[in-house]
Amino acid sequence: DVRARAGGRPGVTAPPFAKIIPHSDGAGVIEAVGAGVPSGRIGARVWIWNGQWQRAFGTAAQYIALPTEQAVDLPEGTSFEEGAVLGIPGLTAVHAVLGGGPVEGRRVLVSGGAGTVGRLAVQVAAASGAEVLATARGVAGLQAAQSAGAAHVFDYAADDLAEQILAATGGAPVDRIVEVEFGRNVETSARIIAERGTIAAFGSAQDMTPVVPFYPLMFKAVTIELVLVYLLSDAERRAAEGNLTGLLDKRALDVRIAEILPLTDCARAHDIVATGARAGSVLLSI
């Protein structure tokens, strides 16, 4: 949301609408329904995805009107605060980890395991039976990834990162990489990925035009999947929603909230996110 507002998306030079209410994610109660939607949905506690995707008015408001499938029932016991983080971060994490099928017994490396998406991805992978490895930076970051379920944690800036990872696995490669910085890490990824492994990349902010080691990846038949939750197919989204619901029902996800501000402090919330100095999501409340 901050990057979209600030014009930080590659190729996007101007806002698509003259007036915009920002934000894609949120949670709340359905107060009214349109034609064709069962009236029984009124009063349902829901979380929202793609609130401001290709439309002018997003979730930084008291009300939003959306297609019924974009309002997903919150599992019993899941708070609105947790639900507000499920849209982009939750769907990204669960699809990046489980979009290729079960990971039980597999080795999954999560890049940036202390970030909002990364820490959720660590939890998803661990709860799904994977051996989880994660990179982070600093004592707090490494502890955050480890507390989420990573069996092995590494400083992502280490010069010998690939060697450290392979030492931790006894020389065995990793089957799946959930990648927040594709360009920065692709050389390391090519060294540690298994044959027919997958790199599920949802970011490359530090290198937006990466040079890819094509042959090392090709001769392992590596799949590179670029994850953009806005464009998941209907089947992929239903699967991701189902996986999220199952994990929430098991209380397997710990959503970190850094700060909750009133809606009137929306600009301040953007400033907090832009500084990067936070440990969790920043929410707006009404």
Which residues does each PLM region occupy?
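Glycine-rich phosphate-binding loop and adjacent beta-alpha segment
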Residues: R184-A252, I286
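NAD(P)H dinucleotide-binding glycine-rich loop of Rossmann-like/cofactor-binding domains
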Residues: P15, S39, W47-G112
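Glycine-rich beta-strand-centered segment in the early N-terminal region that forms part
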Residues: A6-Q52
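Mid-domain Rossmann-like dinucleotide-binding core that forms the NAD(H)/NADP(H) cofactor-binding site
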Residues: I42, A84-A158
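C-terminal hydrophobic helical "lid"/dimerization subdomain
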Residues: A235-I286
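Short glycine-centered segments of the SAM/dcSAM-binding site in methyltransferase folds
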Residues: R45, R107, E131, G197-T198, ...
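NAD(P)H cofactor-binding loop motif with strongest signal on the N-terminal glycine-rich segment
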Residues: G112-G113, E181, S204
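Short amphipathic alpha-helix with an adjacent loop that forms part of the alpha/beta core around
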Residues: D160-G171
